[in-house]
Amino acid sequence: MMLPDWKIEKEILIEPFSKESLQPAGYDLRVGKEAYVEGKLIDVEEAGNVIIPPKKHALILTLERVKLPDDVMGDMKIRSSLAREGILGSFAWVDPGWDGNLTLMLFNASNEPVVLEYGERFVQIAFIRLEEPAKRPYRGNYQGSRRIALSKRRVRK
């Protein structure tokens, strides 16, 4: 069962929480403080925006920390306004028990650069209640992330 707006506000820890981002059956996550584009870490808060060049991908940190109970998972979709500009998103499930800011991958399939402003709503997350709490909620490599998290596959020695 997907959670409606009033249950999201009551049951899911999202900080900082924005009433404007709360949707009937989801929450719009906003562009956070960091991005990673073409091998460079960008301070989006200081720069005011991040530019995703044509035919390139970017990792974008969410402004919000999301903490899920052990019986709720998240499913994310790119906002349609960005999809209409050629932005594609590849997002994993947000597992029950997750706690942290999310690092999300966007790809600019267009021939024009796309600018994302700091604090702009860019991805909607919907919350789905499981029939029962997970026996093994998420406690993996990215748990507690507050900054851009690059792939742990490339960090291995």
Swiss-Prot record:
HAMAP family per record: dCTP_deaminase (MF_00146)
Residues that, per the record, bind dCTP: R79, S80, S81, L82, A83, R84, D95, Q124, Y138
A GO BP entry: dUMP biosynthetic process
Signal peptide location: none
Subunit structure: Homotrimer.
Organism of this sequence: Thermococcus gammatolerans (strain DSM 15229 / JCM 11827 / EJ3)
GO molecular function, one term: dCTP deaminase activity
Known function: Catalyzes the deamination of dCTP to dUTP.
SUPFAM superfamilies: dUTPase-like
Broad class of enzyme this protein falls into: hydrolase
Pathway info: Pyrimidine metabolism; dUMP biosynthesis; dUMP from dCTP (dUTP route): step 1/2
NCBIfam families: dCTP_deam (TIGR02274)
Record protein name field: dCTP deaminase
The EC number(s) this enzyme carries: 3.5.4.13
Catalysed conversion reaction: dCTP + H2O + H(+) = dUTP + NH4(+)
Keywords of the record: Hydrolase, Nucleotide metabolism, Nucleotide-binding
PANTHER family: DCTP DEAMINASE
Family named by the database record: Belongs to the dCTP deaminase family.
